[in-house]
Amino acid sequence: MDPGTLSLFQRVSTKLGWDRDGGLDDAEEKLRKSLKKTRRPALASSDSSTGPAQRLELSDSDNSSGKENRSQEEHILLTSDDEDFEKFLASKATPKSTFKQSASSAQKPREPVPVLSSESDNEFELFLNRVKTPKAKVQPQSMSSSDESLKHFIVDSMSSDDDFVTEKKPSIYKGKAKTVKTPKSVQKTKKPAPSLCNSPVFLSDSDDDCNIVIKSTWRTRHSRPPSDEHQATSKDREETEKPRVPQPTITVKSHTSRDDTCSSEEEFQSLLDRVRQNLGGRTSASPMPSAEPKPQRPCLSTPSATGRKTGSQVPVKDSPVIHTPVQQMPSSRPVLSHTEPRALPNSRVVVCKTPGCFLQSLSAPGSVYCRSFKQNKDELTSKLYQLYNTSVFDSQLPVDMSVTWNNKMRKTAGYCISGQERGTGKRYARIELSVKVCDSADRLRDTLIHEMCHAATWLINNVRDGHGPFWRLYARKAMLAHPELPMVSRCHSYDINYKFQYQCNRCKNTIGRHSKSLDTTKFVCALCTGQLVLLTPSKPRAPTPFATFVKENYGSTKQELTGQSHAEIMRKLSADFASKTRLSQS
């Protein structure tokens, strides 16, 4: 202890009289008595209820104020010299008034006697009789889960219950049954007799609560555990404790999530069986297997999405669950063999029903129009225009619309020019296609229908909306008429085939050109200012026979025609080459 603190403690002890003999002991005794007085109201309003013959012992230490879920060996000790406080606890040992109780339990005086609410149980019994879905296997599970819940819901009479009281959830804490247990049986987690229960167990009769026993821990008050995990743990607890203690005679029945799940699955299965029987009666499908009751699996899945049908013609109790194999289920889908090749997900297997349609063949590399596209592209363009005009646009476009090829378009596949004549006011449209981009039959097929949709919006609907609703309408109509067409999109994604490729020697970026017009001495890479190098140089052409003849005979002919011009020498060489060629051919 530092000198400043020591001097301060000496002054305080001198002022309060602690420096005298026995002064500190007297101060300690006063402090203990003041603490006992302040904690008695909290204990009087606690949740724990005691029996008439119960003996509570007070301890002098604060460690006895254990919180809600203590270990099994821990006891609640109170001092035995405070008999008035024991009487006060015995008169006030009832459940808290914040929880909603039934009308019968609210009218009774506060006495430490076990009170059972049977009104909600009778209503639930009537509901079970209406639904008629008793589960023989689920009821022991429900009883065991209710008994197991008594172990985990231990409410100690200490100040930690105050935060539990503030949780006001009337829809969750609806009291189903209230019993009284001795504290010893609660803390040692043994199954008590039905008439000796002192800790109230709050169950919920709503579907969302899934009959989860409300444990007095912070985690369970602020977050609800999953229903599947709770069901699995309650099942394990039931299996471990079955051989030890027999089942109690008095049970608290509640609408559990397991009952709801099983009954919902049974009703859904019976509905599915009736649908299958109806389908089997109308179609000549394979016979249904004989209805034999099969052992049911434990119902651990989530409830079915199908609504509950209480007024069904065939009760769920009398109809056995039939598991029909998938192969015998009647279906309208064609049965596919595992040996035949399966179509790719992106492939379109729909066959075009338009007469005279040849669009599918344009994607095959071996077709006539694909092999000799450059020679037959004008003929193919005319045939495609007539086919689209009749099948998609109902021959509303002009037959002689201008469709030309443009050599200057380097990246745009095509465009439609629309207008109106000045004198007559007649609307017109013409289409131009790029020679450098539409260099194959399938690209011509896809680009032409795109531009014809633009022309139709202007010539038929008198609308210029770009890629608006009218254009999308004609695009969808084209895909319905010709399913083999790809999606008619706004922009193309073609990889343009350039004749010449330039590459940067620093960042390896490539630039495409249709001609060898890029001067590498003047232009550099736009990304890193590196030097550009031509990747695909032009192939050297072999010299022609006339060039070879001129190279061999130019010197001798020039000597013969001394003083003559170059033109006269070339005329002489041309005449000699022509005479030589005629002699060789003859």
Swiss-Prot record:
GO terms for biological process: protein-DNA covalent cross-linking repair. The keyword Nucleus applies. Residues 65-76, 225-244 have a biased composition (Basic and acidic residues). It is found in: Nucleus; Nucleus, PML body; Chromosome. Its main location: nucleus. Residues 383-482 form the SprT-like domain. Residues 17-119, 176-202, 217-266, 279-318 are annotated as: Disordered. Keywords: Chromosome, Nucleus. Disruption phenotype: Progeny of mutant females display widespread morphological defects and cell death and early embryos have asynchronous mitotic divisions and tangled chromosomes. One of its GO terms (cellular component) is chromosome. Coiled coil: none annotated. Residues 176-191 have a biased composition (Basic residues). The keyword DNA-binding does not apply. Residues 94-107, 299-313 have a biased composition (Polar residues). May play a role in DNA-protein cross-links (DPCs) clearance, ensuring the genomic stability by protecting germ cells and early embryos from various sources of damage. Belongs to the serine-aspartate repeat-containing protein (SDr) family. This is Germ cell nuclear acidic protein. The gene is gcna.
